[in-house]
UniProtKB/Swiss-Prot annotation:
It is found in: Nucleus; Endoplasmic reticulum. Keywords: Cell cycle, Endoplasmic reticulum, Growth arrest, Metal-binding, Nucleus, Zinc, Zinc-finger. GO terms for molecular function: zinc ion binding. PROSITE patterns: ZF_RING_2 (PS50089). CDD domains: mRING-HC-C3HC5_CGRF1. InterPro entries: CGRF1, Znf_RING, Znf_RING/FYVE/PHD. One of its GO terms (biological process) is negative regulation of cell growth. The keyword Endoplasmic reticulum applies. Induction: By p53. It comes from Rattus norvegicus (Rat). A zinc finger (RING-type) spans 274-309. This is Cell growth regulator with RING finger domain protein 1. Able to inhibit growth in several cell lines.
Amino acid sequence: MAAVFLVTLYEYSPLFYIAVVFTCFIATTGLVLGWLGWDVPVILRNSEETQFSTRAFKKQMRQVKNPFGLEITNSSAASLATGVTLTTDCLEDSRLTCYWGCSVQKLYEALQKHVYCFRISTPQALEEALYSDYLHREQYFIKKHSKEEIYCQLPSSTGVEDFGPVPRSRYPLVALLTLADEDDREIYDIISMVSVIHIPDKTYKLPCRILYQYLILAQGQFYDLKQLFMSANNSATPSRDQSPADGSVEHSLLEKAGLAGAEVDPVEESSKDCVVCQNGGVNWVLLPCRHACLCDSCVCYFKQCPMCRQFVQESFALCGQKEADKDILETS
């Protein structure tokens, strides 16, 4: 029996040694990758490593007050033939200028001119940068703190029924909000806001929505205004009823426009708790997915977004530690 056991041990010992060496190699590789900041399985990480590497992604932000607000009212009823209703909410007296059929190329050239040549602080400045390459222009005076509904429509005299197939050379509607009083332009860093709005027509029936919003700063920069996404309660009701057939058609149109990835579940403003601990208030926004879902205590333990599982490249706090402590004192 002893001889048989020794022979068996001799035959299988190389496989045993190979398995041990391979296991040690995997464990060592995981630890080294963890030290270098690569994502490794949780079992090979410790809390100190995770906290240190994630904190390095913190992005410094500067708070800026935006004096402009623009939304679409009853977007389901908007079309090129019937027009669109816009709701404004501005902190100061402003002017709303609407450009129908604005050239896509000229618009982005105008934004670049704001950076290098002159500032787009008035409608006249934008029109000069556009070389008046648009079909129709409308302008309205907006009183501060008044949520006014502005009805805009492309005149039938232009003879335009659609803007052609995708990709298009003209945006259906570009809305510019500027400060009416010149003295107010010295108060705010943001001096104007450009909104690119899609309006359905006979050729392209994607529902009416704001495609892009650009904040124009007095210092010569412009930034794409992005929406932050927070977790929604399952009991929340959708903003509008939609059948499955309508949803599939809308999704196919979004894919053609390259916007299918931008669809997000409805957001409920009352949802403010951390999605992990369900205790602390949400204070951290993860980039590039823009999910606001973690509190100050939980943010240091995640390299991936807990909502969409996308890797976190950067993150920033919605408010500083002093402001958070002040809110806690007020609620207690």
